[in-house]
Amino acid sequence: MVVKKPRPKKKPVTKKVAPAPLAVKKPVVKKVVNQLFEKRPKNFGIGQNVQPKRDLSRFVRWPKYIRVQRQKAVLQKRLKVPPPIHQFSQTLDKTTAVKLFKLLEKYRPESPLAKKLRLKKIAEAKAKGKDVEPKKKPSYVSAGTNTVTKLIEQKKAQLVVIAHDVDPLELVLFLPALCRKMGVPYCIVKGKARLGRLVRRKTCTTLALTTVDNNDKANFGKVLEAVKTNFNERHEEIRRHWGGGILGSKSLARISKLERAKARELAQKQG
């Protein structure tokens, strides 16, 4: 019987693409190194070269007031914050706040200089023998916790504005509940310093508007509506909403590591 020899397999022929006719290799220019200049690499080890400039703010010994405010901010994130305190972190939105402060600007208390000039004019008129008619007292914003509390209790306040960063917070902690009880619209805004500027002081905890001019009643009505929907009508939601309880990056990493270890153990037991 004749045994057939296996035929050798043909090798696949790969076609080479012809090079582009105008492709010319660029000559490599060698960098001329001056032998006079010796390379001296820096060593940034301990006790060696001067260290390069880095951001060392993490290692700065900050003043005590900065350390305290940072620790306070961290604690407020970590600890569980009860609703009466947590509500002070939810402030009035920017657009409504701008409208509100524009309105309050018109009812700033009289400056000492303006008062002096007004009284001087009245005195001069009286000295000349003219009859000075008593003008209607202009409506100003009322400031201070005690004054505002009295106005709320008497139901004279039309709007109460509370600062969110009062320290200690106990000074104004009861005001939102009192406003809700007496049916007075209230809002929490950013900055005791901003309120203080309105009443010509450094800081101010609370303001209250008792009367508004007829020209501003339309704008005041819109602001009141926004304030009521954001604060007074959201009472039940605010009452249930706790704050804080946010873990730091290290704690989260530790928890995730433990969970991974537990998952690995379970997999080994089942496998």
Swiss-Prot record:
PROSITE patterns: RIBOSOMAL_L7AE. InterPro entries: eL8/uL1-like, Ribosomal_eL30-like_sf, Ribosomal_eL8-like_CS, Ribosomal_eL8/eL30/eS12/Gad45, Ribosomal_eL8/Nhp2, Ribosomal_eL8_euk. GO terms for cellular component: cytosolic large ribosomal subunit; cytosolic ribosome. Gene3D superfamilies: 3.30.1330.30. Keywords: Ribonucleoprotein, Ribosomal protein. Transmembrane segments: none annotated. It comes from the Eukaryota. GO terms for molecular function: RNA binding; structural constituent of ribosome. GO terms for biological process: cytoplasmic translation; maturation of LSU-rRNA. The keyword Manganese does not apply. Belongs to the eukaryotic ribosomal protein eL8 family. This is Large ribosomal subunit protein eL8. It comes from Drosophila melanogaster (Fruit fly). The gene is RpL7A.
